[in-house]
Amino acid sequence: MSTNNNKAPTSQSSDKSATTESKLNDNENTETETKTDENNEEKPKMTLKPPQPKIENKVSTIDRVVPSVKYPKSLPLPHDVLFNEDKTINLPKLQEHFFAEGRLNHDDVIEIVKMAAEILEKEPTLIQVEAPITVCGDTHGQFYDLIKIFENDIGGNPANTNYLFLGDYVDRGYFSMEVIIYLYACKINYPNTFFLLRGNHECRHLTEYFTFKEECLHKYSEEVYDFITESFNALPLAALMNGKFLCIHGGLSPDIKTLDDIANIDRFKEPPSSGPMCDLLWSDPMEEFSPEIREHFVPNDVRGCSYLYSYRAVCSFLQKNKLLSVIRAHEAQNAGYKMHLQNDATGFPSVITLFSAPNYLDAYNNKGAVLRYENNVMNIRQFTCSPHPYWLPNFMDVFTWSMPFVSEKVAEMLLVLLNLCNDEEAEKNENAQTVKDTSEEEKRRQMLRAKVKSVSKMMRMFSLLRQERETIMMIKSFSPSRKIPQGLLTEGKDALKKALGDFAQARKMDLINEKRPPILDRVNSRGELLRMNSRGELFRINSKGDLFRSNSYADLKPPQGPQETIKITECHEQNITTNNINPNSITTNENNSNEQLQQQQQQQQQQQPPTTTSTTTQTEVAK
């Protein structure tokens, strides 16, 4: 009987527990918990959960809002993945890592720079390169366009293609570190087929003034910057391609008469502001490139240093050194290349300019181009820009970027307060109709109206700053003072868009940045302050304040060259054909008329149509 009495309550308790659990399961905001008492009977305990609000269209804070944009690599590439067992670089892994905005270990970057510099130091100042080869112009920190060059239908894979780069790998673009490290890695892997020349931006002076140093400090450290700028001193200055073409970054110099003059330059130093080394990096062909210009060299006012060289200067140099042409970079071109007036003695373009940074600064809307020289045929292959990750201008953080948004809201609140005061003043005047305005009250109302107008104008400017932030930052990058031109904001959105219209306008705005930046005050070994005035004259100031002229820079007076007359010929930018050229005598068959050249152009276009990824221009060179 006692047993039955004990079982009955247990059964009833179990039934109650089951009923309670059933009810609790119907309620999402409750939880059940079992608790054992002294008689080993389980009693349910109910815990209430706070009500959960129903949110539609939830946005995860873990997943990307734009799924197509992948996360940047958060960890550096491991050392054993970056380096192969034979101490070469794993280029596919490095490219993949850089493509995902990844970075390297600090020590690995320094090791790559040291290895590349050791190879470059052993090369002569004037290197010899042979065809087949791909020649590239400026890349300026555009890593994603650099990788496009290495595609098979443009420049070719560096593993089985000879390459010659003409300098300007850093500054202006936001991926200069990736460009220089990847090029150095290619040099380490292919030291005998991958060649790098020095450009005017490969120096401490310009990288401090433009973006490269800031990028190094943002991504790595000042120690990395010091190692890289030191490695720039090891880059050769010129290359002789197949014994026929002089390849340099900038151009000719009045101090350079022969190829030996280039080979004898001491390049292991920071480029000076004058002299043959400076001219190889900074000089440009004249805008009016014709035989009518009798001077050979004139000061280069656009660059603020070096010279502009004429058609006569180039032809004289080519004839004396038995060359066909000068291949250079240094200047942005809308088509990615420019074939200057052809040499009357050879029928070949006297100067060829290459520029391999498409849509330069994300503003020029230009094409990039490389020159492929193979089997005595030159193919100029054009290509367009590749999409790349977005960086805020000058590596700006989001708080600085958001200041126009905050300022606009503050201006709106201030305007509301001032308008409120103005409305109260008007209401007060309506109630006091019989009282005439005194001069002080009228003056106060005018001041209040002026404040409202000023704040309204300021609010419109902040609104424009917010809406056109990217355009304004691009205009700032073109300005040497890094400021918006005065009055441009008040002209509105259309004026900003017009300021960044086409290639010609962008280049005109950016022209000031093509000038050699002023030398900052420095202290020499004697503790004297070195300072340059606006005319480019260098002075030193001692501890007493005495001023002395420094003789560190040579006079820029242009030399007078020979005054021979040369027949004017027209340069055809496509399908220039020369027959029976002997490099020793530099003679040519001049029987080809313009009509024949046009017919040859049509025939070659039919034989080799351009691909969808590049535009091909062919130039044949006789053996």
Curated annotation (Swiss-Prot):
**Key word Hydrolase present in the record?**
yes
Gene Ontology terms for molecular function: calmodulin binding; calmodulin-dependent protein phosphatase activity; metal ion binding; protein serine/threonine phosphatase activity
Identify the stretch(es) annotated as Autoinhibitory segment: 459-466
Q: What does this protein do?
A: Catalytic subunit of calcineurin, a calcium-dependent, calmodulin stimulated protein phosphatase which plays an essential role in the transduction of intracellular Ca(2+)-mediated signals.
Region entry Autoinhibitory domain, spans: 500-520
Gene symbol? canA
Annotated residues for binding of Zn(2+): 168, 200, 249, 330
Instruction: Give residue spans, biased composition: Basic and acidic residues.
Output: 32-45
SUPFAM superfamilies in the cross-refs: Metallo-dependent phosphatases
Sorted keywords for this record are:
Calmodulin-binding, Coiled coil, Hydrolase, Iron, Metal-binding, Protein phosphatase, Zinc
Q: What is this protein called?
A: Serine/threonine-protein phosphatase 2B catalytic subunit
Organism encoding this protein: Dictyostelium discoideum
Region: Calcineurin B binding, residue numbers: 390-418
Positions bearing the site annotation: Interaction with PxVP motif in substrate: 401
Q: What is its EC number?
A: 3.1.3.16
Catalyzed reactions: O-phospho-L-seryl-[protein] + H2O = L-seryl-[protein] + phosphate; O-phospho-L-threonyl-[protein] + H2O = L-threonyl-[protein] + phosphate
Q: What is the lineage of its organism?
A: Eukaryota, Amoebozoa, Evosea, Eumycetozoa, Dictyostelia
Q: What is known of its domains?
A: The autoinhibitory domain prevents access to the catalytic site.
